[in-house]
Amino acid sequence: MLLKSPDKSPEKILKLFDEVYSKARIFYLLRTAIDLNLFEYLSSFKTAKELAEILDADLILMEYMLKILNELDLIESKVVSERIYYKNAEITNIYLKKDSNYSIINPIYSYFENIKNWENLADILKNKSNCSNMDVDNFFPKVVRRMADECKCWELQKVLNYMAKYEEFKNAKKLLDLAGGHGLYAIGFSMLNRNLKCYVFDLPNVIEETKKFIKKYNAKNVFTITGDFYKDDIGKGYDIIFCSYNPGGKNPKIAEKVYNALNEGGLFINKQFFPDKEEGIEDYINNMEWNFSKPEGLKKGKIRYTFEGDLNLNDYLKYLEDLGFKILEVVDMSELLGLDENSSSFRKSANPSDSLRFKDNSPAKMIVAKKL
């Protein structure tokens, strides 16, 4: 046996593990950089020695860490008198510094928390029922804060500016942000149309977070309504109802409530994920992770971002038409978020495939429908 080679070389398997291991090391290096607040110290140029002293870190390891971050385009370098100096790249100052208005450090920490599930995958596989239940009362407020930090740095502005072109929006007097969470969309809409009164409807514990954002942005025309949209009345007389990434966003019963709550000629703007099929390993991994947890009170589907009673995109559009809506357009969110006439480098540095939520050929769509 010692002198006989196997029928196949181990190269493929070794290469697979080598590639995965390399990416895992980068992941933990990035986590360490954020945990150590490394980027907070690199607003101006510093040497590896200076940074090592500040962080009380090993100099050799710090030198390599900075070289790696430089290769990842998160920091830039210059050489002065044979010394290498490093400072944050512009995109790092925007998104990876705590004092930035567009910091996404909080959403990024969800990766660091979620990786623990993969480290304990054997336990989850064998004992899912014992470790998968999640307290919705604590879950949603935490998610709301992260979604606020995430959306305000790109998606929020893109959606607001896109919808501002509609005459129906310009003439609207009353808007409902249904299951609006942080309420940033309602706040933004109220800034674009000063005659618009906006209402954010969500669960009581979530609304407590909403109120903090309303106060932060001094949004005088934004108000809150507490309730469960599956069970409670959502009100009437709205000119616009806006819906974004919520569990009932593809549910026909919620769509009917929306129709009944809108004025004639009113707009229903619904931004949701409509996954229709699994297309390879990335979908398999995401869907597997989706099934790690089961928040109490939410009946999740097998596929990521789906829930019991959901309709697929085509069936949902047909249902809206049967209710009495006219579909004005269906916007591909990856295209909407991927266009920036002011930045030629956008597709390289901040395109949807690099964001926390979107990728090319994203199943996320924004439906704009009008009640006839």
From Swiss-Prot:
Keywords: Methyltransferase, S-adenosyl-L-methionine, Transferase. SUPFAM superfamilies: S-adenosyl-L-methionine-dependent methyltransferases, Winged helix' DNA-binding domain. GO terms for molecular function: O-methyltransferase activity; protein dimerization activity; S-adenosylmethionine-dependent methyltransferase activity. Pfam families: Dimerisation, Methyltransf_2. GO terms for biological process: biosynthetic process; methylation. Signal peptide: none annotated. It is an enzyme of class 2 (transferase). S-adenosyl-L-methionine binds at D202, G227, D228, F229. Its EC number is 2.1.1.-. InterPro entries: COMT-like, O_MeTrfase_dom, Plant_O-MeTrfase_dimerisation, SAM-dependent_MTases_sf, WH-like_DNA-bd_sf, WH_DNA-bd_sf. The keyword Lyase does not apply. The keyword Membrane does not apply. Belongs to the class I-like SAM-binding methyltransferase superfamily. Cation-independent O-methyltransferase family. PANTHER family: O-METHYLTRANSFERASE (PTHR11746). This is Uncharacterized protein MJ0086. It comes from Methanocaldococcus jannaschii (strain ATCC 43067 / DSM 2661 / JAL-1 / JCM 10045 / NBRC 100440) (Methanococcus jannaschii).
